[in-house]
């Protein structure tokens, strides 16, 4: 059974490093926004094992018109668990949490090869593809949230 929990930023580093940035040092897996006011980190546990992580921080996106936005960063699921729907469970949980707190949109710089994954979750492309040196092609993806406020 999958369980989504708030985790510490330190709990994200191993999976971030292993899945997203294996060619970089663990220090390069730490983002300046990790400790920003309002930031939070979620993990999905399967039978007590942390299998999926993501970080969220209040950050506007110049191409978005929504006044209140959060950025998703460091989304990753361990290879052996990708058929468990941990990532989509995590994203849906975060979208609900953000909408409940009045956040109007969530966005990310998605790796180009996974943009279809976000599209299936109702996210849309924004702007033109771009390259992040050493990591690869990306596209901004976003979703407008239905707030309860």
Curated annotation (Swiss-Prot):
- One GO molecular-function annotation for this sequence? N-acetyltransferase activity
Give the domain of life.
Answer: Bacteria
| InterPro entries reported in the protein's UniProt record | Acyl_CoA_acyltransferase (IPR016181), GNAT_dom (IPR000182)
What Pfam families is this protein classified in?
Acetyltransf_1
What's the name of its gene? yitI
Q: Which residues form the N-acetyltransferase domain?
A: 2-146
| Similarity annotation | Belongs to the acetyltransferase family.
Organism from which the protein derives: Bacillus subtilis (strain 168)
Question: Under what name is this protein listed?
Answer: Uncharacterized N-acetyltransferase YitI
> What PROSITE patterns does the entry give?
GNAT
Its keywords, alphabetically, are: Acyltransferase, Transferase
Q: Which CDD domains match?
A: NAT_SF
Enzymatic class? transferase
Enzyme Commission designation:
2.3.1.-
Q: Which Gene3D superfamilies match?
A: 3.40.630.30
Kindly indicate whether the keyword Transferase belongs to this entry: yes
List the SUPFAM superfamilies hit by this protein, alphabetically.
Answer: Acyl-CoA N-acyltransferases (Nat)
